[in-house]
Amino acid sequence: MTTSESVQETLGLDFPHPSKPRVLLAASGSVAAIKFESLCRSFSEWAEVRAVATKASLHFIDRTSLPSNIILYTDDDEWSTWKKIGDEVLHIELRKWADIMVIAPLSANTLAKIAGGLCDNLLTCIVRAWDYSKPLFVAPAMNTFMWNNPFTSRHLETINLLGISLVPPITKRLACGDYGNGAMAEPSVIDSTVRLACKRQPLNTNSSPVVPAGRNLPSS
């Protein structure tokens, strides 16, 4: 996002709500973020998409490969768009704009932050300010031993109580070479899961949709 553009200009908040759902895609610091471009392309086929990336996730995301119509917001934008009292606050404007938020991949670190209520970057500030009458999906991605760690179970229970919907990880050979559960679900699965939720309760173009958030915990 260029600093010369206002938050409202990039989000189109001065215009009527579109017929397509507004999806805010976010990536945190996992090697699975290499699939973020694929996620952006899949979601942009049926939704209006904006993207958020943490500093760590940018190690894995090729920004030049993202669809040209998708604006990617980073932590730097949070500060560059605010100069004085009364200016738009990016994480609040993004929260207002989005009908749905999807965090894929969700790293162990960002999961812990959300469960603990921390808000030290753009992504976690959006989640802390999120209106939980609107759906929020997460697709975790981490090493098997991190996934099986007792802290992970506690953190998943906490976000489950918020109404955050889980797209469970899968078992496969991980980037580190280990074999086990913890790999992010395939982009096609994440896309179809969110799209199905939208179809269950069609978008109301006069207001943000209210899609029931699942409360699923992993079987492991």
Curated annotation (Swiss-Prot):
Listed transmembrane segments: none
BP GO annotations: coenzyme A biosynthetic process; protein homotrimerization; regulation of cell growth; response to salt stress
Needed cofactors: FMN
Cofactor: how bound: Binds 1 FMN per subunit.
Gene3D superfamilies: Flavin prenyltransferase-like
Site for Important for catalytic activity, residues: 176
InterPro entries in the record: Flavin_trans-like (IPR036551), Flavoprotein (IPR003382)
Tissue-specific expression: Expressed in root meristem, shoot apical meristem (SAM), intercalary meristem, floral meristem, embryo and tip of the coleoptile before true leaf emergence.
Catalytically driven reaction(s): N-[(R)-4-phosphopantothenoyl]-L-cysteine + H(+) = (R)-4'-phosphopantetheine + CO2
One Gene Ontology CC term in the entry: nucleus
Residue numbers binding FMN: 29-31, 54-56, 107-110, 141
Pathway connected to this protein: Cofactor biosynthesis; coenzyme A biosynthesis; CoA from (R)-pantothenate: step 3/5
Active site (record annotation): 91, 176
Cell compartments where the protein resides: Nucleus
Domain of life from the UniProt record: Eukaryota
EC code: 4.1.1.36
Misc note: Seedlings over-expressing HAL3 show enhanced growth rate under normal light/dark cycles, enhanced salt tolerance and Na(+)/K(+) homeostasis. Enhanced growth is due to increased cell number of root meristematic zone and root cap.
Subunit structure: Forms homotrimers. Interacts with HIP1. Interacts with HD1 in the dark.
Family listed: Belongs to the HFCD (homooligomeric flavin containing Cys decarboxylase) superfamily.
Purpose of the protein: Catalyzes the decarboxylation of 4'-phosphopantothenoylcysteine to 4'-phosphopantetheine, a key step in coenzyme A biosynthesis. Involved in salt and osmotic tolerance, and light-regulated plant growth. Trimerization of HAL3 recruits and activates the E3 ubiquitin-protein ligase HIP1, which leads to the degradation of cell cycle suppressors, resulting in enhancement of cell division and plant growth. HAL3 function in cell division seems to be independent from its PPC decarboxylase activity. Acts as a positive regulator of flowering by binding to HD1 in the dark.
Record protein name field: Phosphopantothenoylcysteine decarboxylase
Organism taxonomic ancestry: Eukaryota, Viridiplantae, Streptophyta, Embryophyta, Tracheophyta
Gene that produces this protein: HAL3
